[in-house]
């Protein structure tokens, strides 16, 4: 786990444009992944518990004002920035999706959890039930 403080390329604790000039980032993980494909520990996760009444993540389109807020009971969120979109997918109104034309926010446990006993367990034993929820709330900012 790498702290985001003093690491502006991955610090989204305040509103920040995602991926501006991502090809020029110096972060080795961003270079290796060809963009964002990381898991962030959510601020809603404290002392082994998640406060799912608080916004875990949010994004806003500066062009349309469309806002997405994510609420989850998971401790982490995987952020993927469409690193391998290549212009071969066409969307609404003929919009062609080029590299980094999209962002995914996936609530989940942390990768490598089985090998990190101090992290929240993702182990599911016979007879147990796993319950996870993720709410995507859309609105428009004016």
Regions found by a protein language model. Give the residues of each.
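Active-site pocket scaffolds in enzymes
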Residues: 9-142
